[in-house]
Regions:
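Glycine-rich phosphate/dinucleotide-binding loop and adjoining beta-alpha-beta core of small-molecule
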Residues: 49-105
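Small-residue (G/A/S/T)-rich helix-start motifs and N-terminal tracts that mark the onset
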Residues: 1-73
């Protein structure tokens, strides 16, 4: 069954120019329904632009919450560490019949 449901595995861009904000905006413009599992948060600190990965257990809970949604495509954004990348791979392997877009940061 084809739906207009798109899953983004994306980070939160504090400036809203990219990441999950840009993903959801793009989906809305194209009349798609976007879902997001947040891979990380970002911030501008005294050290500069920093990435704070989502705890892998929390990320897993997000993915479990979405496991029964019939997605038509998956978009992969910022993967901040190996654990999150491995979980993203599991999602891809579970959805081999739909397109996957990799948008590396």
């Amino acid at each position: 069954m084809k739906t207009n449901y798109i899953l983004a595995l994306s980070g939160n861009d504090i400036f809203s120019g990219g990441g999950l904000h840009a993903d959801l905006t793009t989906y809305t413009v194209h009349k798609l329904h976007g879902f997001v599992a947040v891979t990380c948060l970002t911030a501008m600190t005294e050290k500069g632009f920093e990435v704070f990965p989502t705890d892998s257990t929390i990320f897993a809970h997000q993915l479990t919450s979405l496991k029964n949604v019939p997605f038509s495509a998956i978009k992969i954004g910022l993967l901040p560490n190996v654990e999150i990348a491995e979980q993203a791979l599991e999602v891809i392997q579970a959805h081999q019949d739909i397109p996957v877009v990799l948008d590396p940061v």
